[in-house]
């Protein structure tokens, strides 16, 4: 009786060893990845069966949370759907997707910055723009005409240039043509003027050959010559602003001054 029991135990041990040897030689699925038993969100470690049949725990870098992948996939799918709707023109304006709002907002900001850059330089051309609705426009026209008649005045003085120089003559200080203030003002005018206005003020033959820097330098020299003529003319004839008490008016007595520029008619 006891011998039969030992014989049965030996048979069971032999069978288990044979099954283990067969399982180790089975390489039909050497790269099968399985996850140990455990629910979602648990700390169960995934395991991998390698060629040698031994199970090894995955490293921390190999662990991937399913909920993170799911969220990224959903966001990508939503953005793709919005983009496709925009391309096909099927988006209702009352429910504009977030992607469309981001895409439309950037060009608008860029366009405003570009327009500001383009208009800033033009707005700085002259300190005072001459307009037809200016109440002193008729006076400026007559003053401009008289400036053109100044002896040896360079040709082509514009109305805007005449008004700028007329204002410079009546500065409370720094109106001398060779002074730093007047020189900087004329240099600013030459550098900020539209190139088409610069070309009109210069000889066409020179304009055809010169670079932009050469054109603006030549225009600056011409402005200096014109202002020197205007300065001498106004200090000899008293062409000053009626509403200001300038140094010129303090030097010249009104009774002894013969006004060649009838700007202040009553």
UniProtKB/Swiss-Prot annotation:
Where does it reside?
Answer: Secreted; Host nucleus
- Keyword Glycoprotein among UniProt keywords: no
- What Gene Ontology cellular component terms go with this record? extracellular region; host cell nucleus
The answer to whether the entry has keyword Cell membrane is no
**Where is the signal peptide, in residue numbers?**
1-18
Short sequence motif named RxLR-dEER, residue ranges? 48-63
Keyword annotations for this protein, in alphabetical order, are: Host nucleus, Secreted, Signal, Virulence
Q: What is known of its domains?
A: The RxLR-dEER motif acts to carry the protein into the host cell cytoplasm through binding to cell surface phosphatidylinositol-3-phosphate.
Q: Which family does it belong to?
A: Belongs to the RxLR effector family.
> What does the function comment of this entry state?
Secreted effector that dos not suppress the host cell death induced by cell death-inducing proteins.
The name under which this protein is listed is Secreted RxLR effector protein 128
Q: Which gene encodes it?
A: RXLR128
């Amino acid at each position: 009786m006891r011998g039969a029991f030992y014989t049965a135990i030996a048979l069971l041990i032999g069978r288990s060893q044979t099954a283990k040897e067969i399982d180790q030689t089975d390489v039909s699925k050497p790269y099968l990845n399985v996850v140990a038993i455990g629910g979602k969100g648990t700390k169960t470690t995934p395991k991998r069966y390698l060629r040698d049949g031994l199970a090894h725990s995955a490293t921390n870098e190999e662990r991937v949370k399913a909920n993170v992948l799911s969220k990224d996939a959903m966001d990508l799918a939503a953005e793709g759907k919005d983009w496709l709707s925009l391309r096909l023109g099927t988006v209702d304006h009352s429910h504009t997707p977030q992607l469309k709002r981001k895409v439309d907002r950037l060009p608008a900001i860029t366009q405003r910055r570009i327009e500001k850059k383009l208009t800033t330089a033009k707005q700085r051309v002259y300190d005072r723009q001459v307009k037809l609705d200016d109440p002193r426009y008729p006076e400026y026209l007559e003053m401009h005409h008289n400036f053109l008649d100044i002896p040896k005045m360079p040709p082509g003085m514009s109305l805007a240039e005449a008004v700028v120089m007329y204002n410079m003559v009546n500065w409370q200080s720094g109106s001398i043509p060779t002074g730093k203030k007047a020189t900087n003002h004329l240099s600013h005018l030459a550098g900020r003027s539209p190139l088409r206005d610069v070309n009109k003020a210069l000889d066409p033959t020179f304009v055809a050959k010169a670079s932009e820097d050469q054109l603006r330098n030549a225009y600056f020299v011409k402005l200096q010559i014109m202002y020197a003529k205007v300065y001498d003319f106004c200090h000899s004839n008293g062409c000053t602003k009626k509403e200001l008490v300038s140094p010129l008016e303090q030097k010249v007595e009104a009774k002894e001054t013969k006004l060649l520029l009838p700007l202040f008619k009553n």
